[in-house]
Amino acid sequence: MAVKLKIKKGDNVKVVTGDDKGKTGKVLAVYPKTLKVVVEGCKIAKKAIKPSEKNPNGGFINKEMPMDISNVAKVQE
C-alpha cells in the first residue's frame, strides 16, 4: 500500500508527542514502508560500537533513532 507522505527529507518539523515534545529539527531520513522519520537532535539513543578499523577502541555513540511520522508536524519557515 503506497502512502503519500507530506514530510520529506530536509523539512523542518516539530515533535508534538513523546519525550522530545516541543523540540524542532530537520528531517534526516524518511522510511515510508514503516512510516517513521529520523529528526536531528531528537530521540537520541546510546549505541554500543564494536572495535573496528574506523573506531579501534569501540565504545558508545549517541545516535538519532526513528520515530513515528504521526509524532511530528511540519513547521512553516
Swiss-Prot record:
One GO biological process this protein is involved in is: translation
Belongs to which family?
Answer: Belongs to the universal ribosomal protein uL24 family.
Q: Which key words are in the record?
A: Ribonucleoprotein, Ribosomal protein, RNA-binding, rRNA-binding
List, alphabetically, the NCBIfam families matched.
Answer: rplX_bact
What GO molecular function annotation could you give as one example from this UniProt entry?
rRNA binding
* rRNA-binding found in the keyword field: yes
Domain of life from the UniProt record: Bacteria
Instruction: Report the HAMAP family cross-referenced here.
Output: Ribosomal_uL24_B (MF_01326_B)
The record ties this protein, via InterPro entries, to:
KOW, Rib_uL2_dom2, Ribosomal_uL24, Ribosomal_uL24_CS, Ribosomal_uL24_KOW, Translation_prot_SH3-like_sf
- Keyword Hydrolase on this protein? no
Describe, as the record does, how this protein assembles with itself and its partners: Part of the 50S ribosomal subunit.
One Pfam family name is KOW
Xref: PANTHER family: MITOCHONDRIAL RIBOSOMAL PROTEIN L24
Q: Which GO terms describe its cellular component?
A: ribonucleoprotein complex; ribosome
| Protein name in the entry | Large ribosomal subunit protein uL24
| Function of the molecule | One of two assembly initiator proteins, it binds directly to the 5'-end of the 23S rRNA, where it nucleates assembly of the 50S subunit.
